[in-house]
Amino acid sequence: MTEAPTQKKARQGRWTLFALIAVTIAPVLASYLAYYVWKPSGGKTYGELLAVQPVPAFKLATLDGQPASLAELKGKWLLVMSDSGACAQSCLDTLHALRQFRVAQGKEMDRVERLWLLTDATQPSAAALQQADGAKLLRAQEAIPLPASQADSFYLIDPLGNQVMRYPRSAEPGKVIKELTRLLKNNENIG
């Protein structure tokens, strides 16, 4: 008869030990699952998020040949495209889209600047200059140090001069506008 209470205590002690081990291991297991298995659904971007780093300095000039730099445009969000001065139809479409992205920001549009980096000595056509109305036009005098695929992309540079996003030229305007609006709203203190 003395063995039954001892077995009962032993069984109860084992359950207590298992409970303590489970309580100790549960947070570690939960953190592992949260980090490696359950991916959060938020935080998705439409454009390609680039490694945030300053755009390296490179030689630029105005259309009349005066030296210029991106530092002159610090303090504004920049929508940057690069293309030849000849500006084919895809270039004209991108210039138009960049203007629409800026105008769609309403009262915040003063925080956004458009920049067309000309990659050659060709003078832009009247149609291209009309689409670029209000944009800064600078001639790149050396290779542009932005990530690859610049011919079919445009970029977003933050007010501190860091590359932030890359979008395809065929980007859906509504998605770009929504993302730019969200960026401006969440970063009111930097430009």
Segments predicted by a language model, with ranges:
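Extracytoplasmic
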Residues: 55, 73-76, 109-111, 149
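N-terminal "domain-start" segment that seeds a small globular fold
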Residues: 22, 29, 38-71
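Short, internal strand/loop/helix patches
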Residues: 112-160
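Hydrophobic membrane-insertion alpha-helices, especially the h-region
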Residues: 14-35
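Conserved helix-turn-beta segment immediately C-terminal to the redox Cys motif
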Residues: 95-115
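Thiol-/selenol-based redox modules, centered on thioredoxin-like
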Residues: 144, 159-191
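N-terminal Lys/Arg-rich, disordered targeting/topogenic segments
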Residues: 1-11
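Short active-site neighborhood of thiol/selenol oxidoreductases, capturing the structured segment around
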Residues: 71-92, 98
